């Protein structure tokens, strides 16, 4: 057990991850000047240990090493030890993760990097056991070796550190050239298609991540090209994930990733960002296919978020841990005996048939409910049930099992509020509200955006994190770009011009704080931020899309709807700046490539003026909101003069005969305005572009 008698400095922090280490015998510092001043004064190397509160292997290393007196003595005597919550300081995490990947060929968390007192790295790794095992060096040996090397061969350490720092500087140098062309659009699809798992959906081999932004790209590629495999790859993946154990069939919501190819055994932690992005992906897939199962999944994700990841103030938690009482997945798995005891023999046996529950289990002797191999039609026939009767029985069973599960010890909740991840959920809720015409989803999104505006924007500066009354760290490009995405989706769900105005103000601030005036692209950190050893520009789309990728898409959206060509020109500059990265690995930049698709493919600019109470206006807006038209922009107001500040090009338009009037422009040519709403709907909805 951890030493509870003498807390270290982390006891004064608000981060759930740092607080998990506040009673370690290690003399931890939070990231800051105090730690580096001590390292310089005492001429000691620095351990920067980075993780997050719901990270399984972070827990393992904490228990094996950071709660261990021998390790603590080594660290306290020979090093300065710094703990970093990667979700609060993604800038620090990003810099040193790149170093770990450079030095070891891999990355992940916990991330443990040894640096000089001037923050230059000379050794890096992820999980270290206390003593050597799993083909990994023991942490005791690593600490002994590095402290001796730092003391006795300082010149060698400094050479390694200097070379590593120089590599980072070179990697972030600006690149110029011609912009991305249509061929990049097709290469992105080809690379995604070549990695597609034709049996179980998804991309690549286990561990398999949902990667919803790849699915969003494929939906847009299908829309713009009609390539039938693109849509199949999306639906196959979404269907497989919804059937798999990665989806919680009792409490809803998706886990972070699958440890196997068929989506059966998840890494059980649930992240806000995954569920936010998957909410968007399933909603868009519903727009394209009208598959009611996708709508059902969206409803269930939102139910889960409301029940388990929402503060009373309307903001959203960050994550739920995978572990309970030291066991991964313990909260979520079942024995067959537990199922039968809860449901009784008849309903229990039926549930076990449907959800793959057996005596031997499918995960370490227990069962993860799933529908991967379920023969539903055969089960209905054998039981003499209609689809409706079966569904009602299974819903009854689910509710009973959820009630039983809630009596178990609940996983640790990381309840900090992150601006960037909250913005992703706001965008997902707003899109769901728009497509499903569901006001309560919009209400949830509005509650969360109000919280951000009231608590996480200080003197006009967007901040990173709120927890327990404390706001911390100046926002990064992700915070601004994701929040811009949220505002634009809120606007499209409500056509409230105030959201468009807020989006424009936020964009101006984003450009002022992050834009590289010399070479183009957005830096990860603001011009007013703490200086690290390198100032990065990130464009790779990992589990979460990069700030530059999201910014490029939103610049085009905002530029198109407001007529501000300078925003479109900035996106074009980004096509040039990031071209070498994207051409080297197109599928790794699938969200960024959405912006290229939008920019190069045919699109319409739609302007609608009319009274908010006019049934004709309501009709055309509802039809446009439900349709999947990813390239088009829609500007809506009651009167043209309302647009004079935000979209001045439309201020001189007029309303014809007091009726709702629709203006449609396409490929730099505008049609005559019309008040024939049925005709306008046909024109706008029937075409692919």
Swiss-Prot record:
Q: Which domain of life is it from?
A: Bacteria
Q: Which residues form a coiled coil?
A: none
One GO BP annotation of this record: carbohydrate metabolic process
Q: Which CDD domains match?
A: SSP411
Taken from the UniProt record, the cysteine pairs bridged by disulfide bonds within this chain are none
| Listed InterPro entries | 6-hairpin_glycosidase_sf, 6hp_glycosidase-like_sf, Ssp411, Ssp411-like_TRX, Thioredoxin-like_sf
Quote the Pfam families the UniProt record gives: Thioredox_DsbH
For this chain, the family text in UniProt reads:
To C.elegans B0495.5.
Q: Which PANTHER family match?
A: SPERMATOGENESIS-ASSOCIATED PROTEIN 20 (PTHR42899:SF1)
Please identify the protein, giving its name as recorded: Uncharacterized protein YyaL
Q: State the species of origin.
A: Bacillus subtilis (strain 168)
Q: Which gene encodes it?
A: yyaL
């Amino acid at each position: 057990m951890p030493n509870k008698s003498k807390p270290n400095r982390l006891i004064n922090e608000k981060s759930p991850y740092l607080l998990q280490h506040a009673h370690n015998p290690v003399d931890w510092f939070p990231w800051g000047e105090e730690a580096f001043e001590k390292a310089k004064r005492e001429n000691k190397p620095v351990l920067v240990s980075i993780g997050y509160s719901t990270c399984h292997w972070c827990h393992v290393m904490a228990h094996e090493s950071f709660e261990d007196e021998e390790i603590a003595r080594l660290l306290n005597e020979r090093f300065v030890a710094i703990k970093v919550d990667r979700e609060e300081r993604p800038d620090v995490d990003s810099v040193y993760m790149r170093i770990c990947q450079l030095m070891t060929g891999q990355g992940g968390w916990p991330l443990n990097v040894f640096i000089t007192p001037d923050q230059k790295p000379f050794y890096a790794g992820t999980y270290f056991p206390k003593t050597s095992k799993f083909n990994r060096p023991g942490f005791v040996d690593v600490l002994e070796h590095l402290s001796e090397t730092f003391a006795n061969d300082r010149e060698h350490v400094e050479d390694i550190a200097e070379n590593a720092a120089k590599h980072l500087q070179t990697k972030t140098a600006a690149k110029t050239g011609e912009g991305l062309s249509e061929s990049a659009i097709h290469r992105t699809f080809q690379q995604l298609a070549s990695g597609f798992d034709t049996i179980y959906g998804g991309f690549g081999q286990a561990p398999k991540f949902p990667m919803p932004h790849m699915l969003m790209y494929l939906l847009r590629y299908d829309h713009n090209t009609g390539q039938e495999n693109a849509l199949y790859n999306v639906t196959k993946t979404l269907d497989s994930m919804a059937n798999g154990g990665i989806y919680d069939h009792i409490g809803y919501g998706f886990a972070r990733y699958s440890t196997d190819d068929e989506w059966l055994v998840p890494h059980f932690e649930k992240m806000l960002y995954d569920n936010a992005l998957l909410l968007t992906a399933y909603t868009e897939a519903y727009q394209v296919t009208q598959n009611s199962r996708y709508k059902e999944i969206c409803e269930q994700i939102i139910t889960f978020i409301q029940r388990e990841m929402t503060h009373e103030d309307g903001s959203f938690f960050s994550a739920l841990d995978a572990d309970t009482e030291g066991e991964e997945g313990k909260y979520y798995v079942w024995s067959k005996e537990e199922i039968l005891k809860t449901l009784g023999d008849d309903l229990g046996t039926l549930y076990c048939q449907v959800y793959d529950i057996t005596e031997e289990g499918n995960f370490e002797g227990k069962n993860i409910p799933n529908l991967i191999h379920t023969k539903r039609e055969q089960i209905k026939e054998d039981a003499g049930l209609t689809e409706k009767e079966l569904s009602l029985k299974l819903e009854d069973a689910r509710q009973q099992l959820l009630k039983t599960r809630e009596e178990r010890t609940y996983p640790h909740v990381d309840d900090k509020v992150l601006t960037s991840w909250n913005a992703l959920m706001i965008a997902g809720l707003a899109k769901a509200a728009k497509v499903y015409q569901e006001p309560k989803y919009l209400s949830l999104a509005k509650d969360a955006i109000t919280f951000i505006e009231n608590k996480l924007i200080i003197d006009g500066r967007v901040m990173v994190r709120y927890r327990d009354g404390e706001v911390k760290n100046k926002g990064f490009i992700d915070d601004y770009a994701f929040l811009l995405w949220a505002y634009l989706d809120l606007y499209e769900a409500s056509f409230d011009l105030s959201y468009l105005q807020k989006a424009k103000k936020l964009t101006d601030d984003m450009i002022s704080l992050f834009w590289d005036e010399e070479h183009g692209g957005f830096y990860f950190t603001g011009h007013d931020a703490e200086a690290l050893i390198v100032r990065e520009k990130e464009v790779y789309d990992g589990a979460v899309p990069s700030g530059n990728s999201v910014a490029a898409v939103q610049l085009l959206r905002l530029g198109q709807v407001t007529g501000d060509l300078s925003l479109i020109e900035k996106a074009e500059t980004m096509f040039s700046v990031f071209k070498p990265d994207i051409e080297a690995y197109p599928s790794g930049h699938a969200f960024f490539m959405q912006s290229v698709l939008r920019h190069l493919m045919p699109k319409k600019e739609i302007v609608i003026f009319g009274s908010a109470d006019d049934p004709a206006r309501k009709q055309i807006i509802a039809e446009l909101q439900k349709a999947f038209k990813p390239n088009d922009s829609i500007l809506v107001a009651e009167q043209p003069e309302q647009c004079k500040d935000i979209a001045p090009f439309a201020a001189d338009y007029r309303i014809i005969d007091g009726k709702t009037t629709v203006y449609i422009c396409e490929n730099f040519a505008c049609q005559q305005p019309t008040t024939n709403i049925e005709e306008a709907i046909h024109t706008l909805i029937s075409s692919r572009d």
